[in-house]
Every structure is written in C-alpha cells, then in structure tokens.
Amino acid sequence: MAVLLAGTAAAAPLVVRSSGPSAKTYPAGKALADNAKLTLKAGDTIVLLDGKGTRTLSGPGTFSASASTVAAASTGSTLNALVSGGGEKRARIGAVRSASGIDKGGKVPNPWYVDVTRSSNMCIADPANVTVWRPDASKATTLTIAGPNGSTTLDLAAGQAMASWPAAAAISSGSQYKLSWDGAKAPTNVKFIVVRPATTDMTGIAQSLIEGGCKEQLDLVIEAASGNASHG
C-alpha cells in the first residue's frame, strides 16, 4: 500500500516512521536517494516524507523511494504554512485542526505550540518567539513557570487558549521548565531544544524534530502531511 500527498517543493525522501523487522535498516531520520529501492519484509511499515507529502509502505515487497502519483494541491499550502515563520507567526494547520486555536479533540492545533498539559521535548527555532497553548480555555487561570533561574507567572483569561511565552523565563537549548496551575493533576515538564534546520522544507523540519527527540511535534507534522492523502 502506498499513500502520497501533493506539495510544491521537491525534497529527497526521509524515513519518519519505521516499525517491523527492517526498522534497523530503515530507521527514522534516514534520508534516501530518489532512486532508492526499499525491500520490506512481512510486518514492516515505513512512512516516507518528501516535498510532495507522505507515503506509507507496507511489506512484504520492494518499493521505490519516490512515486509519481499526485494528490490534491491544497495539501501543499498546508505544508508550506508549517515551514514558514515561527511561534505565533506560523500558520495553524488549517487542514487538520480548528483555526480558532481551540480544538474540541483536545489536541494542540500547531506543532510549534507548547501544550502545557504534556511533558515533552519541545523543538523551537526562535527562543524569543514561543507560544503556549492549553486545551481547556473555559476558565481563567494562572500558569506558573519554574526554571533554573526562578519562577514567573502567565495569566490566561477565560476563552484564551494561547499566549506568548514570558520573556522572564528565558529559553536556551537544553533549558527545562516545570509548568503548573490550579486544577492540574500534576506539573508538566518541558525541555526546549533549539533547532536550526539545514533546509526549510518539510524533510529538513522533520529531520530536526527527529534529531531533537521531539516525537509529538513530529507526529503532528506527519499528520498534517497526511491529512488529504489519496490511495494508489
């Protein structure tokens, strides 16, 4: 089975997910030549990302790393939005999430937003332009952000799902912060990884997320790239 999405930029295929007997041969983060052939065994599932979107390959069989099938061009604009700008300037994933910033499914609407309810590695490109997000904005709350140089607070009004990360809590690569607020079951821990993608295309972004260990962000990027998939 192969799934392909259309985009506008050409990029070499990148393995972004891998499971099964051949996972060591084709690990996540492995870049492939356009003319590469993948020989998969029964139980193998490989997800490839390139400038056209994602392809899912399921073994057994031999597959080309590239494909000629082209799907809806609307996906290309979604992918372009993901790689342009940072923080609040990044467009939301319109094809995947609600444009309001409040998603009824409780999932973060943009991979570059810090979900205050989840402990994770958080890859960012611009430490001075970071956005925090909460899935439940029904009540006003005060977010306490504790880090290596003390604590600061961030007030969120009722109905406010997003806010800029406070300048008082300076971010550098490797810095860790504990987030807490009234009603939280437990504090969450966020470790920031400053990434400088070698390229600004989707594969460059995905490679940076893989190297930074930012799995949840990678999952959202893959989901955005797979949102309008066609089968072929």
Please name every model-derived segment.
Residues 148-165:
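Solvent-exposed serine/threonine-rich low-complexity stretches and specific carbohydrate-binding patches
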Residues 12-31, 37, 51-129:
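Flexible, surface-exposed loop/linker segments and immediately adjacent secondary-structure boundaries
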Residues 43, 135-141:
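Short proline/glycine-enriched turn/loop motifs at strand-loop junctions of beta-rich domains
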Residues 67-68, 103, 113, 194-220:
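Low-complexity, Pro/Ser/Thr- and charge-rich linker/hinge segments at domain boundaries
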Residues 166-176:
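Surface-exposed, short loops/turns at beta-strand junctions within beta-sandwich domains
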Residues 76-91, 203-232:
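Compositionally biased low-complexity segments at domain edges in trafficked proteins
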Residues 6-8:
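N-terminal signal peptide c-region/cleavage motif recognized by signal peptidases
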